[in-house]
Amino acid sequence: MLKRKELARKAVRLIVKKVPKEKESILKVDEFLGTLSTAYRKDKLLRNFFLSPQIDRNAKVKALESLAKKYDVPKEVLEVLEYLIDINAMALIPEIKRLYELELEKLMGMLKGELILAKKPSKKLLEKITKTINDILNRQIEIEVKEDPSLIGGFVFKTQAFVLDTSVKTQLEKLARVGGV
C-alpha cells in the first residue's frame, strides 16, 4: 500500500498529465481543487460524506461531478478523483491541492500569489504591481487580490515560498520593536 504522501504525489502527477496544457484549463483545475480543499477542511458534513463507507460510491461521484461542472473541469481530472473515492482517500484533497500548486510553479512556470492591499487598487496600479512582481520573480504570476485596511498603506505579496511586505503597518511594527517609537 502506498503511503499517503506518495499517493497524493501520484494523483497530482496524473492530474497534471491529463489536464490540457492551456492556461485556462490549468487554472480551472486549480480553482476547483482549492474550493474542494477548503470545503473539505472547513465543512465537517462534506468531509463525513466523502469518508463514510455507508454512503454509496455513486452518490459521492455525482456530488463531485456537480461541483466539477460549475468549474468546467476536464473529465480526466474527475477520473483521478473517482479513484480516490474508490480507495477512500479523499482526505488527501488538501495535500493534492498544495502539491498541484507546486507543480504549476515547476512545470508551467506559473506562480499563484496573493496580493493584500489596504484598499482596492485601480486597474492601472494593479497592472504595474503585477508587472514589477513578474520582473522580480521572472515568472508569470496569477494574482488574487485581497483587502486589509489594517495595512494602512503599501502591500503584502505572498506565494508559497516568498513574501514581499511593503506595508506601512509592518514598517511601524519594526520601528516599535527597535524602540524608535
Curated annotation (Swiss-Prot):
Cell location: Cell inner membrane
Source species, domain of life: Bacteria
Location (main, coarse): membrane
Cystine connections: none
One example GO MF annotation: proton-transporting ATP synthase activity, rotational mechanism
Pfam families according to UniProt: OSCP (PF00213)
Keyword Hydrolase: no
Cellular component, GO annotation: plasma membrane; proton-transporting ATP synthase complex
Membrane topology: Peripheral membrane protein
Keywords: ATP synthesis, Cell inner membrane, Cell membrane, CF(1), Hydrogen ion transport, Ion transport, Membrane, Transport
Keyword Transport: yes
Gene Ontology BP annotations: proton motive force-driven ATP synthesis
Function: F(1)F(0) ATP synthase produces ATP from ADP in the presence of a proton or sodium gradient. F-type ATPases consist of two structural domains, F(1) containing the extramembraneous catalytic core and F(0) containing the membrane proton channel, linked together by a central stalk and a peripheral stalk. During catalysis, ATP synthesis in the catalytic domain of F(1) is coupled via a rotary mechanism of the central stalk subunits to proton translocation.
PANTHER family listed in its UniProt record: ATP SYNTHASE DELTA CHAIN
NCBIfam families: ATP_synt_delta
Quaternary state and interactors: F-type ATPases have 2 components, F(1) - the catalytic core - and F(0) - the membrane proton channel. F(1) has five subunits: alpha(3), beta(3), gamma(1), delta(1), epsilon(1). F(0) has three main subunits: a(1), b(2) and c(10-14). The alpha and beta chains form an alternating ring which encloses part of the gamma chain. F(1) is attached to F(0) by a central stalk formed by the gamma and epsilon chains, while a peripheral stalk is formed by the delta and b chains.
The protein's name in its UniProt record: ATP synthase subunit delta
Organism expressing this protein natively: Aquifex aeolicus (strain VF5)
